[in-house]
């Protein structure tokens, strides 16, 4: 097999982020496809965002149905523990404070294309490879069905 002994190809475990996942042997691996499925409103996007934030690994996050402002508000809430309404107010009234907190997520690279194709995703990955000299360790496609 080509992948044996080649960690640069992928397969190594991503950093653990939730004890419940560890306890149940749920492991996300670099460059592998994992699907988070559930009913609308079940928290799939929130879980994906929390994974990206906590893993602290270079991440491409493609959000097809949520805008940049909403994602910044959710992320700020995760980082600070504020409610989303408090976070929205701080982002609007004190953007410098928000930017400082959001810097904890500088390892996440965003795409808000509402209808990305495979070529678009490949272009995003290539851009990150050129920027970092390596592929993103985690790729999140939020809302695969749209």
Describe every region a protein language model picked out.
Residues 59-146:
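Conserved inter-motif catalytic segment of the P-loop NTP-binding fold
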């Amino acid at each position: 097999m080509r992948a044996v002994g080649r960690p640069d190809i992928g397969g190594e475990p991503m950093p653990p982020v939730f004890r419940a996942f560890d306890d149940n042997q749920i492991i996300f691996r670099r460059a592998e496809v994992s699907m988070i499925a559930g009913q609308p409103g079940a928290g799939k996007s929130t879980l994906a965002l929390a994974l990206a934030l906590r893993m602290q690994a270079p991440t491409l996050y493609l959000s097809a149905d949520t805008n940049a402002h909403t994602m910044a508000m959710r992320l700020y809430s995760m980082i600070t523990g504020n409610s989303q309404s408090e976070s929205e107010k701080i982002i609007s009234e004190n953007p410098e404070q928000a930017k400082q907190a959001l810097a904890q997520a500088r390892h996440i690279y965003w795409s808000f294309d509402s209808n990305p194709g495979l070529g678009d995703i490949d272009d995003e990955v290539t851009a990150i490879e050129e920027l970092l000299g390596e592929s993103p360790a985690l790729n999140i496609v939020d809302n695969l069905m749209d």
